[in-house]
Amino acid sequence: MPCTKEAQLRHVGYGRFYMLVNRILMALTTEQLLKELHELKHDADLEKWLASTSSSVVTLHAYLDFLLKKSGFKRAQVCRDAHVDATFGYQIFQGTRGASRNTLLRLALALHITLYETNVMLRLGGCNALYCKEKFDAIVIFGLDHQRSVPDVNDMLYDHNLPLLEA
């Protein structure tokens, strides 16, 4: 049996998906994609480029599923730890409902994921990435780095007179 999380994910059949997620994690910027597009010469090149870029699109719910499998946590436990209603959490994980930035941040804390993974999740959810110059975001980043719980992060936010992660 493979020993690293990455190898285990590949072993259980997540190879293609893992590669797509890695492409997102490598953060192909709009500028890079635009540069590639400008360099195309022929219609056939455009067709190939469109096929390659559309196949690299990962949805929020697919990424959440990937993170869930990577973490080894159960969806119900993540929802509980994130203080997200089980039905609403299930809908987010299935892709039938969207989530606010704060809800995604609570899920990130419950999943114990990295700042980088959190920012990818936020971008896929149509939200702004965490920005360390913002007090609120800096506290959340600290919580992510130190695997703090949602109540712990809320306490830190409260101590600094900032809005809480929970509505």
Language model feature labels by segment:
Residues 39-74, 156-166:
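A short, Lys/Arg-rich alpha-helix, primarily the initiator
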Residues 68, 79, 108:
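The alpha-helix within a helix-turn-helix
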Residues 96-109:
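Short, basic-rich loop-to-helix N-cap that marks the start of a DNA-contacting helix
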Residues 5-6, 16-17, 22-27, 31-34, ...:
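Short, charged recognition helix plus adjacent turn
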Residues 1-59:
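N-terminal flexible/basic segments that precede or flank functional cores
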Residues 74-81:
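Short alpha-helical "recognition helix" segments of helix-turn-helix
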Residues 83-99, 124-126:
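Recognition helix of helix-turn-helix/homeodomain-like DNA-binding domains
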Residues 76, 87, 116:
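Key DNA-contact positions within bacterial/archaeal DNA-binding proteins
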